[in-house]
Amino acid sequence: MPCQSGIALLIRRIRRPVWAATVSAFGIGMLTYLFALTNTLFLTGDALNNVYFDGNLLWIGRWSSQWLSSLSTSYTMPYVNGLLMIVAVAALSGMLVSVFEIRSTVLAVVSSAVLMCFPTVSATLGFLHNADAYMLAAMLATLGLLLLEKIRWGLLPAVVLIAVATGTYQACATFVLGMMFVRGMQLMICRPDVGAKALLLRAGRYALCLVLAVSLYYVVLLAMTGGGQDAVGDYQSVTKAASLETLAALPRNLAGCYQDFWQAVGPLSTEEGCQMGSWPNHVFIALELLMACVSFWALQGRKPLRFLAMLALCALAPFFLCAIRIFAPDKVYSLMTYSVAGTYLIGIVLMDSLPETLEKLKDRSAGRAAGRALAAASWAMLACLVVCVYSWSIYANVKFHKAKLDYENMYAQCATFLALAEANEEYVQGMPVLVIGDSSYASGRGQPAMHETKMYYTFMKYCLNVDMPFGTANEIRDQARMIEDTEDFVLMSCYPNEGCVQAIGDAMVIKLSEQIY
C-alpha cells in the first residue's frame, strides 16, 4: 500500500473527535508558542547552566530522562525541543479524547486547547533543555492509560509505560492519577450502565496499575544506582517519597494538596498589563458542580449511595487532581501540576453528555426549567474556558517577551565585559574571562538572570563563541571562588571604576560591585 493510501486509511479509521483534537492541538500549540520557538530564550534561573544538556538526571531519580531527551540535540534549541513538545501534547490530547470517549468535535477541540495552553506546558517550554522529554513522558503515561482502558490485557504495558514516564518526571504518575479520576467521575455520573461493582473493580485496577508502576520505577532506580543512599540526591524529596516518614506526614501533605489545588486554580495571570483574576476558574468550578449534580439526577435517577459517593469524590477532587504534594512535599510549582487540567476536563465530559441529560430531563417534573438552566450553564462554562485559554496564552507570551529582553540584556552585559577583558594589555587569546560578583540585574522570573560567575562564563562560551578552556560552568565557578579569596582580588576596584579588570593567575577577572558567595 503506498504511503499516501496508508495515511488516508489511518485518517479514516481514527474517530473524528480524536483526529480533530490532535490536529487542533498542534495548530494551537504552534500559534501559542511561535515566539518561543523562533527566539533564543532562557526562561529559567538555571537555563544558562544547561545550554548543553545530555538529559542525564539520574542523580535526582529520573532514570529515563536521558533516553527521552536523546530524540533532540544536546543543545537547547527551541525549534527542535519545543516542536517535539508540541507534537507530544497534541498526541496526548487525542489519546485523552479517546479515553474519555468525547463525541463532540467542538468539545474535543476545546479539550485540546485546554491541554495545550495550560500553564504547565508553557512552564515546561521554559526548561528548553528537557521540554521535549517532559511532555514525551506525559504522552507515554497517557498511552499507558489508553491501553489500560481499551485493551483487556493492557495492565502490563500500562505499568511499564507509566513507570518509564515517571522515570523522566515524577509528576507523570500524579498526572495519570488525575486523568483516572476524571474518567471515574465520568463513569459514575454519565454512565448508568456501569454499576457499583464495575466502578469498584475499575478503581481497583487503576490503583493496582499506579502502585505497580511506582514500584517498578523505584526498582529500576535502585538497580541503576546500585542501591546506594548517596547515589540519588534529595531534590524535591525524590528519595523520601516512598519512605515511612512521608507516609506519616500524609495528613499534612493531604492538606497541602488542597492548598496547591486552589493556588493552581487561582489568578489566571499576574503579569503587569495582562492581569486576570481567578473568577473564570471559580465560576467554572461552581457551574461544574451544579452540572454534575443535575446530570446525576437526570441520568442515574434515585441512587442515594452512589450520589453520596459522588459527593465524597468531589470533596476529594483537589487531592486526586493535585496529588504531587504526596511525592514532593517540599515545593510545588506549575511544572508539576498538569493534572489540575482535569478540573476543566470533568466539565467538558459533562457537557459532552448534556444531550442525553436534557433528553432525560424532559420527562421529569421541573425538568424543562432545569434543562434550560443546564444549557445556559454550558454556554457560561464554554465562555470561562475561552477566557482561561486566552489568558494562559497571553500570560505565556508576556513571559516569553520578557525572557527575550533578559537575553538581550545578558548579551549586552557579556559583550561589554568581554570587550573590557580583551582591551586589557595582559589579555591573551583563550584566557577564561571570569565575571565575579553581582551585576544587580534581577529578572522577575525568580532569580537574577546573571547572578553567578558560571552564568557569565557559560553565556560567553556558548552564545558569544568565546574559546574557553573549561567544558562545564561548575568548573569555572570553582576556580572563581578560589580567586575571590586572593589578596589581588580583594584589592581590585569594582566595575565600572578603573582597575576593575585584572589578570589573576591564568584568568582575566572582572570584579563587579557586589559579591554573592
What are these regions (language model features)?
Residues 58, 62, 85-87, 106-149, ...:
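Membrane-interface micro-motifs in multi-pass membrane enzymes
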Residues 112-116, 301-326, 388:
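Transmembrane alpha-helix segments characteristic
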Residues 2-59, 63, 69-89, 99-112, ...:
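Intrinsically disordered, polar/acidic, low-complexity terminal segments
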Residues 175-211:
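Perimembrane helix-loop-helix junctions
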Residues 263-266, 270-308:
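Hydrophobic, aromatic-rich transmembrane alpha-helices
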Residues 141-155, 187-194:
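Membrane-interface transmembrane helices that cradle and orient dolichyl/undecaprenyl
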Residues 154-171, 175-176, 181:
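Membrane-interface alpha helices of multi-pass inner-membrane proteins
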Residues 94-109, 149-152, 298-302:
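Transmembrane alpha-helical segments of multipass membrane enzymes and assembly factors
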